[in-house]
Amino acid sequence: MSSRTLYDKVWNFHQVKELPGGSTQLFIGLHLIHEVTSPQAFSALNEKKLGVKFPNLTVATVDHIVPTSNQQRPFSDPLAEEMLSTLEKNCKTHGIKFHGIGSNSQGVVHVMAPELGLTQPGMTVACGDSHTSTHGAFGAIAFGIGTSQVRDVLASQSLAMNKLKVRRIWVEGELQKGVYAKDLILHIIRHLGVKGGVGFAYEFAGPAIEKLSMEGRMTICNMAIEGGARCGYINPDETTFKYLKGKEHAPKGQEWDKAISWWKSLASDSKATFDDEIQLDGSSIEPTVTWGITPGQGISIKETIPNPEFLPKNEQQIAKDACKYMNLKPDEPIEGQSIDVCFIGSCTNGRLSDLQEASKIVKGNTVADGIRAFVVPGSQKVAKEAKEKGLDKIFLKAGFEWREPGCSMCLAMNPDKLEGRQISASSSNRNFKGRQGSAKGRTLLMSPAMVAAAAINGRVTDVRKFLQE
C-alpha cells in the first residue's frame, strides 16, 4: 500500500465495482455541464423517464455559445438563445445549480468551477468537454466525456471506465523569466507527440512544476489532452491548499482540517511505480510557438520552421500539409511572422494571472496598426478582479477590446471568429484547421504574454525583449 500513485488512490476510492469485460464502475464526485453537450443527454433522460440521481453533484454554466460583446437577452443568434434557454429549463426541472448570464459566477466552465472551490483534491471530475483535464491541477482525476456519458452520469452518477496507465513527467529546474506554463506544456507536447499520451494519465511533477501557481498548473493539465492523455494531474501541496482556503465551496472549520489531512495522503508515494517516466529540464525551455495545425507542431521562438524532409517519416506528410495550410516556408524563422488578430482568453489562459502577465507587456504600448486584439476574461470573477486592478484600462488604452466572459475565439461557436485567411496569435489550446471560425483561418498558439507582444509589434515577438526594457 506504500507504492501507489495518486491516480491509483483516487481510482480505488471511487471504484463502485468491477464490470464484465474488465472495466470499472466509477463514481463521479463532480459533474460539470454546459449548453453544448447537455441537451441531448437531458432529452435521453426524459425519453426514459429518468431523473438526475444526485442534482447537488452537478453544476452548470454557459460559455461556448455566449457572445462576448453584448450579452443582453435574447441573444441575436436564435440558436444560441435556444441552447441557453434549454439549459436553463433543464437545470430548473432537475434542481441543478446554474451559473448563468447575469450571475457573478458565470464563466468558462474550467475557470469558474475551480475559483468557486468546487474542484478539490481526490475528486473524480467529469464534463462533456475535452479540456476537463484542467481540474487535475488540484490532484483530481478529471476527464472529458461524450454526450451519452453525460446522460449516464446524470442518471447514475457513475461511468464505466477502463483504468489508464500512468506516465510521470518530471520537470527539473525552474522556468526562466519570460517562459510560462503555456511554454512548458507546448514543449512537452512537442517532444512526446499529440498521440504520445494515448492510454495514459500524465502525472506532472518535479521542481519546475512545484514552483508553478495553481493557475499555471491548470494551464499544464488543461492541455494534457492535446498530448493524447485522457487526464493529467499534479499532486496536491501547500500551493493547492492555500488556493482553496476560503473558497465558497471549500470545507470550513474542522472539516477543513480533516480535508487537509486526507488531501495530503493522496500524493503519489515516494516508492510509487509508474508505467513510464520522462525527465525534462525546465530551465532550458524558451518561449514556444506552434507553427502548424496540431499543438504538437511547436518550436521555440529562436527556431525555424522545420523542414519536413528532415523529420521522421511518420511526421513528414502532416508537416508538409501544415506548411501549405499555414503558408509558411521550411527553414524560415517563426520570430517575425506577421499576424492579423490577437486573442487572450480561454480555459487555458483566461485567468487573472494570465491577464496580469499580458498587461505588463501592454502597459505603455499601443497595438500595431491593422491588428485586431481583444481580451476575454475567463469568468465574471476574473473580469471583476481584473477591473479592480485596472487591467481593463491598460488594455483599452493600448487599443485592445475588453470583452465579457466566454469561450470566444478559442472555438468560435459564437460571433468571435477569424475571417478568410487571417492568422491569429492565440492563448487558446487548439490550432486545428478552421478551429477559430474560418475554414481557412490560421492559429499560432502561445502564452498570453507572447500574444501581447505580438499585438504590440504586429508580428511574432520574443516577449523577453519587452521584459528587458
Swiss-Prot record:
It comes from the Bacteria. Binds 1 [4Fe-4S] cluster per subunit. InterPro entries: 3-IsopropMal_deHydase_lsu, Acnase/IPM_dHydase_lsu_aba_1/3, Acoase/IPM_deHydtase_lsu_aba, Aconitase_4Fe-4S_BS, Aconitase_4Fe-4S_dom, IPM_dehydratase_rel_enz, IPMI_cat. Its EC number is 4.2.1.33. Its cofactor is [4Fe-4S] cluster. GO terms for biological process: L-leucine biosynthetic process. GO terms for molecular function: 3-isopropylmalate dehydratase activity; 4 iron, 4 sulfur cluster binding; metal ion binding. It catalyses: (2R,3S)-3-isopropylmalate = (2S)-2-isopropylmalate. PROSITE patterns: ACONITASE_1 (PS00450), ACONITASE_2 (PS01244). The keyword Iron applies. Keywords: 4Fe-4S, Amino-acid biosynthesis, Branched-chain amino acid biosynthesis, Iron, Iron-sulfur, Leucine biosynthesis, Lyase, Metal-binding. The keyword Aminoacyl-tRNA synthetase does not apply. NCBIfam families: leuC, PRK05478.1, PRK12466.1. Catalyzes the isomerization between 2-isopropylmalate and 3-isopropylmalate, via the formation of 2-isopropylmaleate. Heterodimer of LeuC and LeuD. Belongs to the aconitase/IPM isomerase family. LeuC type 1 subfamily. HAMAP family: LeuC_type1. This is 3-isopropylmalate dehydratase large subunit. It comes from Prochlorococcus marinus (strain NATL1A). The lineage of its organism: Bacteria, Bacillati, Cyanobacteriota, Cyanophyceae, Synechococcales. The gene is leuC.
